């Protein structure tokens, strides 16, 4: 834990200008575009979620270092028995994901590296992200904030396990979050939202940052 990197350190404006309000940037891929990504990911042995997670990490790394930690919102419905999937409730949990991006690595290698780390984390979800942040703070002797979030609900509705963990029209309101990248599949299309806290970044950063995600 003591060797885990901090959150991405993007250029920010003065703290006195920060407000607890978010703006939303949205985008969408067509059914054909999204199906092509899903099929390509499957052929390479990676998940579509990890593809988009890697794109998000790469975008942040353009304004930060290649080594940082991200806050992942996970659907964590324990397999106690078959009846668990009939229960309506909040089964989301947090994972703090280590990211180490080498500038000379090819894209598929970066995806596989992130996927390996994520799968390793999932094997230890009893010690979730909240516990990790608390332990890092204890070891480093400081309050730790991982305000860059990635939230995926890909395939949740298809699997019939939940109604989804993302509300397409509901903007993030959590003050400990700077950017929440949300992805979901709706009627065969990919919908993605970026909820960005106002007063954290200058407009000169926000537009290129989101555009790099859209165009990658």
Each model region followed by its residue ranges:
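Glycine-rich, acidic and aromatic/proline-enriched surface loops and short helix-turn segments
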Residues: 2-3
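His-Asp-centered acyl/peptidyl-transfer active-site segments
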Residues: 6-12, 19-23, 31, 40-53, ...
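AMP-binding/adenylate-forming domain of the ANL superfamily
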Residues: 20-39, 108-112, 170-188, 211
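Beta-strand secondary-structure signal
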Residues: 26, 71, 149, 180-182, ...
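Carrier-protein-dependent adenylate-forming modules in NRPS/ANL systems
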Residues: 35, 45, 95-96, 125, ...
């Amino acid at each position: 834990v003591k060797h885990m990197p901090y959150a991405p350190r993007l250029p920010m404006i003065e703290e006195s200008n920060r407000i607890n309000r978010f703006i939303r940037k949205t985008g969408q891929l067509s059914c054909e575009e999204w199906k092509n990504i899903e099929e390509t990911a499957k052929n390479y042995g990676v998940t579509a979620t990890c593809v988009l997670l890697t794109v998000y990490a790469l975008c942040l790394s353009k304004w930060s270092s290649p080594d940082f930690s991200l806050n992942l919102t996970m659907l964590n419905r324990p397999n106690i028995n078959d009846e668990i999937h009939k229960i309506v409730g909040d089964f989301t949990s947090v994972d703090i994901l280590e990211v180490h991006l080498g500038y000379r690595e090819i894209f598929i290698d970066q995806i596989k590296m992130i996927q390996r780390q994520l799968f390793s984390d999932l094997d230890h979800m009893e010690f979730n992200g909240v516990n990790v942040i608390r332990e890092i703070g204890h070891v480093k002797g400081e309050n730790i904030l991982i305000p860059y979030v990635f939230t995926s609900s890909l395939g949740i509705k298809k699997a019939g396990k939940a109604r989804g963990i993302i509300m397409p029209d509901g903007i993030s309101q959590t003050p400990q979050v700077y950017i929440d990248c949300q992805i979901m599949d709706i009627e065969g299309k990919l919908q993605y939202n970026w909820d960005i806290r106002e007063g954290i970044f200058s407009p000169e950063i926000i537009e290129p940052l989101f555009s790099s995600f859209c165009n990658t």
